[in-house]
Regions:
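Phosphate-ester processing/binding pockets and catalytic centers
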Residues: 1-287
Length: 287
């Protein structure tokens, strides 16, 4: 599937997914994949997280997720707020039995009512130093490759490999959380698709929606959990894997991968060679 790709062999898997082509959702031909990003400019890692499922599954997800939100006394799930008991969750005591039970329920809904999940993280400093200069000319006249955009592209490539295998005939509409830079990311995705990268084949469309969409909140949960673990790996803290992430990745169709300094150093010569051989990826001057 990666015969010609800007993203080939970029990272290593913390938890590799088993291909989902034989799973129960094989009969669902048109899916939706929801994508969110965790981490910011002040953090070690940037992580994109995504879940994919068919519309009937997402409808069941919405009912179950809404019930947990109602019991939590909140309207919208933001993982950072929930796990730190602030914002809409400020009335909950951190690590109280109520808090732990709600965490278990949110994770349970994400596990039961999705088909596959993907998270991909990048080491921010290493990306800025090693990869960003190589990608400076890639994109369109209005869209360049940000670290968030590159994490999203790689996350979607994993989704195509493991959740939407080419021989399955399944397709998906991609929904990103609305926010700064997402319009440019969508333009970049359309640009990559127009260039014919095979992993983009199952993706029918790219759009944004507000965080009020429940499936985007599940993507936020996976991005946050991936960000916590991948940051720990990058910083060498050696902490045990969080129970919430352990529960999420017990599902065999969840993939968590990353590219730190070592992985990006190995990837840089491939990327440089690829761009030299494929000048059509470069921005065209405005007329």
């Amino acid at each position: 599937m990666l015969a010609v790709s800007l993203l080939d062999s970029i990272g290593d898997a913390l938890h590799p997914a088993r291909s989902a082509k034989d799973r129960r959702f094989v009969a669902i031909k048109v899916n939706r994949i929801y994508v969110d990003v965790g981490g910011g400019s002040e953090h070690t890692a940037i992580v994109a997280g995504a879940y994919v499922a068919g519309q009937p599954t997402w409808r069941r997800f919405g009912v179950a997720w809404r019930d947990v939100l109602r019991d939590a006394g909140a309207r919208v799930f933001h993982a950072t707020d929930f796990f730190q008991c602030r914002g809409e969750f400020a009335h909950i005591t951190l690590n109280s039995p109520e808090h732990l039970e709600l965490a278990k329920r949110f994770v349970g809904v994400a596990r039961r009512h999705t088909a596959a999940g993907f998270a991909f993280g990048l080491h921010q400093r290493a990306y800025d130093e090693l990869i960003a200069p190589e990608l400076a000319r890639v994109g369109t006249s209005h869209a360049h490759v940000t670290i968030e955009g590159y994490a999203i592209l790689t996350c979607l490539m994993l989704g195509a490999q493991f959740g939407l295998p080419r021989d399955s005939g399944r397709t998906a509409a991609v929904i990103l959380e609305d926010g700064p830079g997402m319009g440019a990311t969508i333009e970049l995705l359309n640009h990559i698709k127009a260039l014919g990268e095979e992993w983009t084949t199952p993706y029918l469309s790219f759009t944004t929606m507000a965080k009020s969409q429940y499936p985007l909140q599940s993507a936020d949960l996976l991005a946050y959990e991936g960000w916590k673990k991948i940051t720990d790996v990058f910083e060498g803290a050696g902490r045990d894997t969080r129970k919430s992430l352990t529960a999420l990745i017990e599902k065999l169709t969840v993939n968590v991968s990353y590219a730190g300094e070592d992985e990006l150093t190995r990837f840089k010569p491939y990327l440089r060679r690829f761009l030299r051989n494929h000048p059509d990826y470069e921005k065209r001057p405005q007329m």
